[in-house]
Curated annotation (Swiss-Prot):
Keywords: Amino-acid biosynthesis, Arginine biosynthesis, ATP-binding, Cytoplasm, Ligase, Nucleotide-binding. This is Argininosuccinate synthase. The keyword Amino-acid biosynthesis applies. It catalyses: L-citrulline + L-aspartate + ATP = 2-(N(omega)-L-arginino)succinate + AMP + diphosphate + H(+). ATP binds at A18, F19, S20, G21, G22, L23, D24, T25, S26, A44, G130, T132, D137, D195. It comes from the Bacteria. It is an enzyme of class 6 (ligase). Belongs to the argininosuccinate synthase family. Type 2 subfamily. L-citrulline binds at Y100, N136, R140, S193, T202, E204, E281. GO terms for molecular function: argininosuccinate synthase activity; ATP binding; protein homodimerization activity.
Length: 444
């Protein structure tokens, strides 16, 4: 068994813990200190929409026994990784055309690298977090952590039988904190769990594991419950501007940073519940899970970006962009966003697709994912309506005789195709006749 993963608490050694301030990490930090480890707490500011006071979290960590507690601002890096994912179309999970924008995998890529980098500055080479052995995050953090620090070892309280025996549930953890003088009140038990960052929110587990429970039990944290009749959602026009593949304006307004642009995109999309989806997906270990997702800003920017992509690039480029995006989305989901094969796909899309994407798209947003595109403007468009106008135009790029030649040359294989179908009929692979899909094939 690998000695990278520690199954028992390393007594007397520095242990970095990704500290959220919630019940699990609070109890784990105090427990590790009492058992003889030297815990260091690291909190990632990812712009979580449900977090009210980031600065209070390190103070809480110190109260629970942290040797040192640091707040790491990850928002700028997260915003740029989100833009990179949009530029590459790095999204492989969708249902009925509604996309999951890989917001949790993007958050883990940033958290895993930036927190471990901060730990290295403090000479902390053991890392713990709250991910369980059944999920994706345990593998994502493992990869990003070791990628950042090859000397890293990993200790997870939730893989330590002693911790599980003593503090195996929420009730036990709450009682442990109270017994040690902390007035910890458990929050009301929700029907599902939520994890979020600035790019999106994930709702899963508990009642949402049952497919007869759906979006109607979820209380959105980034927008409105658009499915409810008592929620008023007014139609709204919004114009998104891109320069060289980078979103730069919303309704003509520029922003001081990518973070500020994302926050405004979230506000606009959130007013409509844009970007919410219900997905059944394959986890890394090939077992299926179910999640309900929010990503209002990502959805808004993605729609506008893809509209410009289709207006600017040719069919083969768009096809390759989509194929590469599906593959890159899987790599991102698997915790391989910074692997060479992912960087190769990213560079291809960002250089040869995104660089040409300059322009503005105006949309009307309604309820949920209901929207219309009202206008598309770009100096780089290869869409020229006069080429295919149904009206008579002067200096037309081609005439009827040109099309006759194209039809002849482009379809020389019709005879070959008919002969092949005849072979399939002769061998019994196809049946001809009145009720078959090729009823006239046997007629010469």
């Amino acid at each position: 068994m690998s000695n990278t993963i520690l199954q028992h608490l390393p007594i007397g050694q520095k242990v970095g813990i990704a500290f959220s301030g919630g019940l699990d990490t609070s109890a784990a930090l105090l427990w590790m200190r009492q058992k003889g480890a030297v815990p260091y707490a690291y909190t990632a500011n990812l712009g979580q929409p449900d977090e009210e006071d980031y600065n209070a979290i390190p103070r809480k960590a110190m109260e629970y026994g942290a040797e040192k507690a640091r707040l790491i601002d990850c928002r700028n890096q997260l915003a740029h990784e989100g833009i990179a994912a949009i530029q590459c179309g790095a999204f492989h999970i969708s249902t009925g055309g509604v996309t999951y924008f890989n917001t949790t995998p993007l958050g883990r890529a940033v958290t895993g690298t930036m927190l471990v980098s901060a730990m290295k500055e403090d000479d902390v080479n053991i890392w713990g977090d709250g991910s369980t052995f059944k999920g994706n995050d345990i593998e994502r953090f493992y990869r990003y952590g070791l990628l950042t620090n090859p000397s890293l070892r990993i200790y997870k309280p939730w893989l330590d039988n002693q911790f599980i025996d003593e503090l195996g549930g929420r009730q036990e953890m709450s009682e442990f904190l109270i017994a040690n003088g902390f007035d910890y009140k458990m929050s009301a038990e929700k029907a599902y769990s939520t994890d979020s960052n600035m790019l999106g929110a994930t709702h899963e587990a508990k009642d949402l594991e049952y497919l007869n429970s759906g979006i109607r039990i979820v209380k959105p944290i980034m927008g409105v419950a658009f499915w409810r009749d008592d929620v008023t959602v007014k139609a709204e026009e919004v114009t998104v501007g891109f320069e060289d593949g980078v979103p730069v304006t919303l309704n003509g307004q520029s922003f001081s940073s990518a973070v500020e642009l994302f926050l405004e995109a979230n506000r606009i999309g959130g007013r409509h519940g844009l970007g919410m989806s219900d997905q059944i997906e394959n986890r890394i270990i090939e077992a299926k899970s179910r999640g309900i997702y929010e990503a209002p800003g990502m959805a808004l920017l993605h729609i506008a970006y893809e509209r410009l992509v289709t207006a600017i690039h040719n069919e083969d480029t768009i096809e390759q962009y989509r194929i590469n995006g599906l593959r890159l989305g899987r790599l991102l989901y698997q915790g391989r966003w910074f692997d060479p094969q992912a960087l190769m796909l990213r560079e291809t899309a960002q250089r040869w697709v995104a660089r040409a994407v300059t322009g503005e798209v105006t949309l009307e947003l309604r309820r949920g994912n209901d929207y219309s595109i009202l206008n598309t403007v770009s100096p780089n468009m290869t869409y020229h309506p006069e080429r295919l106008s149904m009206e008579k135009v002067e200096n037309a790029p081609f005439d009827p005789s040109d099309r006759i030649g194209q039809l002849t040359m482009r379809n020389l294989d019709i005879t070959d195709t008919r002969d092949k179908l005849g072979i399939y009929t002769h061998t019994g692979l196809l049946t001809v006749g009145k009720d078959s899909m090729l009823p006239q094939l046997d007629k010469k």
